[in-house]
């Protein structure tokens, strides 16, 4: 069994998935990562041509720089050698699905809504590539894959860009750079293209998905290209009544001849489609209404056009074989199992094919020269002056070179254009002049400089007015301050500095210091109250006990300091007062003690208000024989409770009261057992 061909020591090539004008695509296996991939190689018969080698490498560079889920990913690049000839290759994501061309050829009709959803995927890919500075230049059904789960994948980024710098032009409808049915007017006329050309091609593709026919058909590529330049397409709803006016408007705006009045970005077109799907108004409706009323989209019959011209930057024109209309299900030009089997042609047939191609090429150039000129005869020698204002000097020069105008430049200060941009032109935009005429342009050196006024301590409204009157832009940032709210605290740049009009001055504006509010937590527990006070992160809380005789206040918040609803600075501390049950104190036993001993015992228990009953001896040696309140009695506050002692002389006395066993003393209430 023959060993499979292996590239780079890891990519085993399987069956051919498709062949195109300059490359072959293989189903391959990545032995290192164990995954399926697609490998595109430069055709061996073209590999000896350095120009094709360079174009293929540029394709690899362009495609490898794009990483987006709606774009077929490039994993790796490399070179293989056959008979000492370098064969570059690109390793790509293998997509299991079919192309939109195969879907169209299947005869199945898509719902308009599904068509719009697929177009959104295409536009997301273009939006990403355009931001990366890459224009696809060949959006068509064969270059858009639909995976088995319905995801859109755009492929062959960079091919049209790489091949576009050769001298090739249209030979057959299916074998051109920018297929004729999806060609933008600027491509057909040989003019410079930008991202808006891709949007025109996307409009052609959307038209075909909706109606199952391209917007323009003809017997030859030149006839189709002529219609792209001169004819207006019919509304898609002419062919399918299910298509809404909003869908018509989106398609027709994408197909406007003048790029300036087409969609200006993939994002803008995608937003309109999403609005249409949501049942919302679309911007294209108003734009196309203006065209119908003879606005910007009207194309007068005598509008001059530019003759189709070839690019002189490449080598000799080379005929490429036409692509098979049935390109297979994998998005590479055709699958082997679906290709029509054709008999091998003899060398004579090849010679006739080359001669026929040369004749078609010459015819295309001649037809382009006459058919695309404004009056159908020799090219018009007058051209309208473009709008140079707002362009950079380099961009203005490029536009002038495209239509054979000569530019002169002078520099001066301009208030309405940044430095380096064109701020004035003579003649004005739209003036018809002879080719090789001179257009005088003024390049801005920047706006005149103005001293920044001092607005510190002024109110914001007054400060903004003063700065804006001088031509400055104003930005503000707020800072908490004790100064009045709206007062300017500082400015940047500093007062007196000279700046161009339109420069930005940043103002620091005072705003009121934020305050925290003490919440009402009375009646809560300590933990509940602390959590509520500290919940905002601006306050801290601490609990303290306070005795209370009210049993309902025990364990509950009685009050706070500061009081509830008080405005305080962030970070302030709130003291939470919690009720605590009062502890009872027993009156100690002091009977039989000397008066000095009794006082000491009572004071140690907190009874500081000790009195001697009237008529009782008050010397320290006197003996206590009774007290009021009686020993063992419980009181709330010993310091506030007076204790009255009855004493007898210290030398004794033989009454029972002297030894503590006496009864009550007559006439002294409260004394006794």
From Swiss-Prot:
Stretches that traverse the bilayer: none
Domain Protein kinase, first and last residues per copy: 11-277
EC class: transferase
Family to which this protein belongs: Belongs to the protein kinase superfamily. Ser/Thr protein kinase family.
Chain segments annotated as coiled-coil in the UniProt record: none
Keywords, in A-Z order: ATP-binding, Kinase, Nucleotide-binding, Repeat, Serine/threonine-protein kinase, Transferase
Name of the protein this chain belongs to: Probable serine/threonine-protein kinase SCO3848
Residues forming the catalytic site: 138
SUPFAM superfamilies, A to Z: Penicillin-binding protein 2x (pbp-2x), c-terminal domain, Protein kinase-like (PK-like)
Catalytic activity: L-seryl-[protein] + ATP = O-phospho-L-seryl-[protein] + ADP + H(+); L-threonyl-[protein] + ATP = O-phospho-L-threonyl-[protein] + ADP + H(+)
SMART domains recorded: PASTA, S_TKc
GO function terms (MF aspect): ATP binding; protein serine kinase activity; protein serine/threonine kinase activity
EC number assigned by the record: 2.7.11.1
Residues annotated for ATP binding in this entry: 17-25, 40
Annotated signal sequence range: none
InterPro entries reported for this sequence: Kinase-like_dom_sf, PASTA_dom, Prot_kinase_dom, Protein_kinase_ATP_BS, Ser/Thr_kinase_AS
Chain spans, region Disordered: 302-345, 472-500, 613-641, 653-673
Domain named PASTA: residues: 379-445, 446-511, 512-580, 581-649
Natural source organism: Streptomyces coelicolor (strain ATCC BAA-471 / A3(2) / M145)
Biased composition (Polar residues): 479-493
């Amino acid at each position: 069994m023959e060993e499979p061909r292996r590239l780079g020591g890891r990519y085993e090539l399987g069956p051919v998935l498709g062949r195109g004008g300059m490359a072959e695509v293989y189903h391959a296996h990545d032995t290192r990562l164990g995954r399926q991939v697609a490998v595109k190689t430069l055709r061996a018969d073209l590999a000896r041509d350095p120009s094709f080698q360079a174009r293929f490498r540029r394709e690899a560079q362009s495609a490898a720089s794009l990483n987006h889920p709606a774009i077929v990913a490039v994993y790796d690049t490399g070179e293989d050698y056959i008979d000492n000839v370098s064969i570059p290759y690109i390793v790509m994501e293998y997509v299991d699905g079919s192309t939109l061309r195969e879907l169209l050829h299947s005869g199945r009709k898509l719902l308009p809504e599904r068509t719009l959803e697929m177009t959104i995927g295409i536009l997301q890919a273009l939006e990403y590539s355009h931001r990366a500075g890459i224009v696809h230049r060949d959006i068509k059904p064969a270059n858009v894959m639909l995976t088995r789960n319905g995801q859109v994948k755009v492929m062959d980024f960079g091919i049209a860009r790489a091949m576009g710098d050769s001298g090739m032009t249209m030979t057959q409808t299916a074998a051109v750079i920018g297929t004729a049915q999806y060609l933008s007017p600027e491509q057909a006329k040989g003019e410079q293209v930008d991202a808006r050309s891709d949007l025109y091609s996307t409009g052609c593709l959307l038209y075909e998905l909706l109606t199952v026919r391209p917007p323009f058909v003809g017997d030859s590529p030149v006839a189709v290209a002529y219609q792209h330049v001169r004819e207006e397409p019919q509304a898609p709803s002419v062919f399918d009544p299910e298509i809404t006016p909003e869908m018509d408007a989106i398609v027709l705006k994408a197909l406007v001849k003048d790029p300036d009045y087409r969609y200006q970005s993939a994002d803008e077109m995608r937003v309109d489609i999403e609005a249409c799907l949501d049942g919302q108004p679309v911007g294209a409706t108003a734009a196309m209404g203006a065209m119908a009323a003879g606005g910007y989209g009207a194309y007068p019959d005598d509008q001059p056009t530019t003759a189709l011209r070839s690019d002189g930057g490449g080598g000799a024109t080379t005929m490429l074989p036409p692509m098979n209309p049935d390109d297979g299900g994998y998005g590479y030009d055709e699958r082997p199992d679906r290709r029509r089997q054709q008999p091998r042609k003899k060398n004579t047939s090849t010679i006739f094919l080359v001669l026929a191609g040369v004749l078609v090429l010459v015819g295309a150039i001649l037809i382009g020269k006459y058919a695309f000129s404004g009056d159908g005869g020799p090219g018009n020698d007058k051209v309208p002056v473009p709008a140079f204002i707002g362009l950079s000097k380099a961009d203005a020069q490029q536009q002038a070179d495209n239509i054979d105008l000569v530019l002169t430049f002078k520099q001066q200060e301009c208030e309405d254009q940044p430095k380096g941009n064109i701020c004035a032109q003579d003649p004005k935009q739209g003036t018809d002049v002879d080719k090789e005429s001179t257009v005088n342009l003024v390049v801005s050196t920047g706006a005149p400089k103005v001293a920044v006024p001092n607005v510190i301590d002024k109110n914001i409204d007054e400060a903004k007015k003063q700065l804006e009157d001088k031509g400055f832009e104003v930005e503000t940032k707020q800072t908490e301050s004790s100064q009045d709210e709206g007062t300017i605290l500082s400015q940047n740049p500093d007062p007196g500095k000279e700046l161009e009009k339109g420069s930005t001055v940043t103002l620091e504006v005072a705003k009121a210091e934020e305050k925290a509010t003490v919440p009402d937590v009375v009646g809560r527990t300590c933990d509940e109250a602390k959590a509520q006070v500290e919940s905002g992160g601006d306050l801290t809380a601490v609990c303290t006990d306070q005795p209370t005789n009210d049993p309902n206040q025990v364990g509950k918040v009685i009050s706070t300091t500061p009081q509830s609803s008080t405005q305080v600075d962030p970070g302030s501390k709130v003291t939470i007062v919690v009720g605590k049950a009062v502890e009872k104190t027993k009156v100690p036993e002091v009977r039989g003690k000397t008066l000095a001993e009794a006082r000491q015992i009572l004071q140690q228990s907190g009874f500081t208000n000790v009195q001697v009953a009237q008529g009782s001896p008050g010397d320290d040696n006197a003996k206590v024989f009774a007290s009021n309140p009686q020993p063992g009695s419980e009181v709330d506050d010993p310091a506030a409770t007076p204790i009255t002692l009855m004493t007898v002389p210290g030398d004794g006395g033989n009454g029972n009261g002297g030894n503590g066993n006496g009864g009550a003393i007559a006439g002294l209430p409260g004394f006794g057992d």
